[in-house]
Amino acid sequence: MLYQILALLIWSSSLIVGKLTYSMMDPVLVVQVRLIIAMIIVMPLFLRRWKKIDKPMRKQLWWLAFFNYTAVFLLQFIGLKYTSASSAVTMIGLEPLLVVFVGHFFFKTKQNGFTGYSVQWHLLAWQF
């Protein structure tokens, strides 16, 4: 639980720090520095597991990794130029809730009790 709280604090402060760095450097450079630090940490694990992945799936994984991490971080930090850090964190925090609603209304997926409880909790927390 302690590591989850620590990860939440680091993640939630990243957009606030990103907004402050606009006066010092370009947002693309901020994203590159973040990803280089993450690459240094994850590279030993990556090299160990990479050979076990099927070759046809590797190209799909590269595209998924690019769009899921690089493009999303870049778009979030570029979006900070046009809005405040608090509204950006609010929009990003609502993403899990929107995924549940899109899945329910467009794809007719059924949610379990925990999902319903967490949606109600998010709606209640959003009111305050």
Curated annotation (Swiss-Prot):
The keyword Transmembrane applies. Pfam families: EamA (PF00892). This is Uncharacterized protein HI_0976. InterPro entries: AA-Vitamin_Transporters, EamA_dom. The keyword Ribosomal protein does not apply. It is a multi-pass membrane protein. It is found in: Cell membrane. It comes from the Bacteria. Keywords: Cell membrane, Membrane, Transmembrane, Transmembrane helix. SUPFAM superfamilies: Multidrug resistance efflux transporter EmrE. Residues 9-110 form the EamA domain. The chain crosses the membrane at residues 5-25, 27-47, 60-80, 87-107.
